[in-house]
Amino acid sequence: MDYLIITAELRKELPEGVDFAGWQLTQWEKPGAFLRRTQEGGTICYRTLPQLCRMLGFAAQGAEQVTEVEPRFRELSFMLDCSRNAVPTVATVKKLIRRLALMGYNALLLYLEDTYTLEGYPYFGYMRGRYTHGELREIDAYASIFGIEVIPCIQTLAHLNGIFHWKAFDSIHDTKDILLVDSQETDALIRAMISTCASLFRSRKIHIGMDEAEMLGKGKYEALHGPENRTSILLRHLNRVTAICREYGFTAKMWSDMFVKALRSLPEEEWPAHERQIREQVPEGTQLVYWDYYARQKEKYDRNIKLHRRLSDDVSFAGGAWKWSGFAPLLDHSMLASRLALESCLEHGVSDVMLTAWGDNGNECDLWTTLPIMQYYAEVCHTGAVDISQDVMTARMQVCTGIRYEDMMATSRLNYVPNNPAPGMISAGPAKYFLYQDPMLGLYDRHVDAAGCGAHYRACADEMNLAAQRNERETVVFETMKNLALVLERKCDFGIRLKQAYDASDRPGLEALAEECGEIIQRTERFRASLEKQWREKYKPFGWEVQDIRLGGLMCRMRTTASRIRSYLNGEVQHLEELEEERLPYEVCNAENGVYPIVESREWAHTVTAMDI
């Protein structure tokens, strides 16, 4: 065991000046881990490398004595989304690995749709920042230093939008983002995926995806073979894919939602027969991964774990650190849902638990905003308690990451506007649509609490400014959040003020708003610059072009808005037709004091226009 390498690498994340000279590190066969500080240094006894790394964190924290029994979860993993535009650099993944090690994780899943190189398939991941074989081997080797197993998390059925951008894959395209099942060409592609993973990773576990394939068999498959029950197609494909996995020594994990959706589409009296079909036809050794990022009632987790146990004896759980609703996370909701989910997992003896960090629609939110939830999962796993005090979370996260827990939690406040107090509406990120909604169209204006929204974002900007000063290791994250809040301070209610001034024929007010467009453009450019710096520090360059296009479009529309207002004021046009349209709520719902509740709207294309884009 090369302790010098382990301690030298971990010191990159630990407080400056930490030294492990005089510490005795001993691997034993007993369950759990133990630390005792002495005058000479101290003693750490551990069974597994992740336990050692966690204890080294306690040593750096200044702990006098720590005793932890065996982790409550056999596999505690973090899933890193490497497929939604932002592909983390090898250096970023290594930093993540060090932080996971100090927390006590023993597995890392890399979510790779098409962002890895497949020999013989040049368009697979083309211009998407795909990893080379050398990069993935380097990540795998580095994680092994700390006893962290890197597990490939690929897609073998749906979520393959990237490859269908290219005509090279037309022949195996069923519909939407779904592969054509029962095709020799599809089987050849999947074999290439699995054999490649076998050559790159030490792990003999592989996650084969297969989630959210609702349109399976409804496109080219139906044209070739006629209509067929979706579950039957899925089970046949699953057996074919897992047979290939076994050839390469892999045991498979898969998302379970397609089976659960099939059951819930039927009357409950028909469930037992379909449960038996699934249990009998899911290949032995295949783990069903029950994912749930939403529920705020423990009973839902209890009920769903029991349902999954009727489908398979091998069930794991995946929760979420919500970073996929825009630039700001939803950490209060994530913490609430995580507490309930993990309590249920502990009660029901779920052995494997995963924390996901998806990056839907552009991967706009910074990876490190997930650190509080990451830390929470680790503390629950290693203590068996779900009530972790803020003092413990603060101390542990400070030593494992160098970042203040309270400051990172505060990044969520950009989504917790006056009509959406924490923990907020599930999955709603108003900061994104307040930023991107068109100033002349006001698609979301009825959902803005104009009385307090601007002041809220000014307070957020001040808070993020202080956080940037207090967190030297991740200043850029807080600077970016500050600059976003400064844009939103002016823009969140801009469309409301513009419509009011136009309806009132308030010419001085309209002129002032035309001038304000320039200020919003300047603030947006500062936000864009800090976001780019944040991106360049962590991700490959591929995918940044999307942010340039979106933010550039926003600034262009602000210039157009100023021009349109002035054209109206100087008499070039008699009306501004966009402002004469009645503002409707984005969704039909009940208003309170004239303000409609916020809505879930995460897709940029739906936010910026009512047109096709």
Residues covered by each model-derived region:
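Generic preference for hydrophobic/aromatic residues in regular secondary structure cores
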Residues: 25-26, 35, 66-70, 84, ...
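Feature activates predominantly on carbohydrate-active enzymes
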Residues: 41-246, 253, 316-319, 324, ...
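Substrate-binding groove of N-acetylhexosamine-processing glycoside hydrolases
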Residues: 2-21, 31, 38-39, 98, ...
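Carboxylate-rich, divalent-cation-coordinating active-site regions
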Residues: 2-73
